[in-house]
């Protein structure tokens, strides 16, 4: 078997990918296929080299339906890591906060962003210190809203003063405040909501977490997920991420997904909102070329 070996000596990088691949693979029947993990160590992993083919409308539709079932496999809460993984995750060179317990609504209110303060969310190198103990305010019996989570964990950490000027950060802050108010909250797709109603341990979708189109490999056997940043999240974020850089037969994927697991009304108007996280990540990693898009999204929803 022709293989690919990925190596990274930085703490937790390989472990996060290994855990994410295994977690997504648990849902791969009837969920989306996931690249097999052949072997791994603390700083490396091996996968088969996938054969790439041109996607077809049929393959796109099959992928849309399968992705709906992956999401419906569920996660305990927003920001949940793959089971067994400790610490924060990564999207490319950017840190990704993972919540090992659900943030309760009352505690989330006490820790609201208020201002999108500057922070260093990019990789500071292998010798940088990291928080040793979890924030005790990250637990409560009443789970916070999606908007509060999205503002605090997925937008604010990347609104740093190296990338954004003061006026731009102020606009992003307004978006964060509106998200925290709850007016932009919305439900998960139907299969995820059904799973939440059936299982008290499911509170969010099981998401790939970095589902730009390059992380979908089209093979002779159909679409295969690679390079996840797996987490508990909102299913619409995966769907929105597919469109950030364009995706073959995107409308076919959406239609098949929506047939298998109907999306909540107004989902098309929320695509850009759910793209804000991946755009902010790209700004943190690659600089100001992504700022105009982030500012446009903030202005639209703030």
State the predicted function of each range.
Residues 168-225:
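A mid-sequence, solvent-exposed acidic-amphipathic segment
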Residues 161, 174, 251-254:
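Phosphate/dinucleotide-binding and metal-coordinating scaffold of catalytic cores
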Residues 25-28, 71-78, 162, 183, ...:
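A general structural signal marking secondary-structure boundaries and capping sites
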Residues 272-280:
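Hydrophobic alpha-helical segments that form the core
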Residues 124, 282-302:
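ATP/Mg2+ or Mg2+-diphosphate-binding catalytic cores
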Residues 139-151, 200-206, 213, 217-269, ...:
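Active-site Asp-x-Gly
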Residues 2-145:
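ATP-binding pocket architecture of kinase catalytic cores
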Residues 157-166:
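Solvent-exposed, charged helical/coil patches
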């Amino acid at each position: 078997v022709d293989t690919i070996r990925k190596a990274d000596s930085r703490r937790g990088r390989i472990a996060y990918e290994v855990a994410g691949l295994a977690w997504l693979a648990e849902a791969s029947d009837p969920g989306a296929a996931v690249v097999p993990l052949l072997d791994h160590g603390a700083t490396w992993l091996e996968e088969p080299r996938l054969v790439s083919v041109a996607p077809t409308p049929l393959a796109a539709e099959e992928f849309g339906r399968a992705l709906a079932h992956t999401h419906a496999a569920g996660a305990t809460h927003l920001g949940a890591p793959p089971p067994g993984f400790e610490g924060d995750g990564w999207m490319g060179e950017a840190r990704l906060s993972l919540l090992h317990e659900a943030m309760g609504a009352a505690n989330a209110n006490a820790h609201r962003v208020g201002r999108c303060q500057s922070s260093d969310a990019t990789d500071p190198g292998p010798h940088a210190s990291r928080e040793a103990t979890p924030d005790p305010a990250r637990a409560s019996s009443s789970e916070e809203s999606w908007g509060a989570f999205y503002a605090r964990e997925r937008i604010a950490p990347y609104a740093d003063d190296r990338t954004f000027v003061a006026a731009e950060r102020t606009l992003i802050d307004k978006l964060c405040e509106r998200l925290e108010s709850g007016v932009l909250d919305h439900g998960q797709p139907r299969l995820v909501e059904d799973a939440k109603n059936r299982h008290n341990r499911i509170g969010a979708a099981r998401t790939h977490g970095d589902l730009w189109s390059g992380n979908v490999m089209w093979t002779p056997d159909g679409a295969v997920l690679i390079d996840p940043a797996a987490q508990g999240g909102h299913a619409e974020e995966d769907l929105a991420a597919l469109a950030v850089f364009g995706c073959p037969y995107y409308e076919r994927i959406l239609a098949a997904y929506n047939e298998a697991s109907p999306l909540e009304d107004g989902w098309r108007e929320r695509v850009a909102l759910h793209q804000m996280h991946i755009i902010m990540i790209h700004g943190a990693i690659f600089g100001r070329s992504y700022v105009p898009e982030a500012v446009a999204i903030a202005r639209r929803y703030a």
